[in-house]
Design a protein with these regions (language model features):
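Cysteine-centric segments in proteins
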Residues: 1-106
């Protein structure tokens, strides 16, 4: 059975332990965040993606099958249209405008 774990630290400093268990022969998958199960899937024997929220942050779990082996990845989704990502883009635009304004003044 394959096991992986990651630690996500939120903006407020809260710590979230994300992990998975993936059966080698059955392909059964369990993904958890702290002590809460967020995904259960059966017969995952090919590449697949899963998305779930940690607070208001959309996270992606990637399972990639390559030459009979599985590779696992965890990342924060900063592209999909969510309230958090809209706020992130708005803040970035503001910072760019401020940088350009300061650059023109000096």
């Amino acid at each position: 059975m394959s096991q992986m774990s990651w630690t996500y630290i939120a903006d407020d400093g809260a710590r979230y332990d994300v992990g998975l268990f993936h059966g080698d022969s059955t392909g059964h998958l369990l993904v958890y965040c702290n002590a809460r199960i967020v995904v259960i899937d059966f017969s995952v024997l090919a590449s697949k993606n899963y998305s779930f929220f940690i607070n208001d942050e959309l996270c992606d779990l990637v399972i990639e099958e390559k030459d009979g082996k599985f590779l696992y990845g965890f990342k924060v989704d900063e592209v999909t249209d969510t309230a958090r990502n809209r706020g992130r883009r708005k803040m970035l635009r503001t910072e760019v405008r401020q940088s350009l304004l300061i650059g023109f003044l000096f």
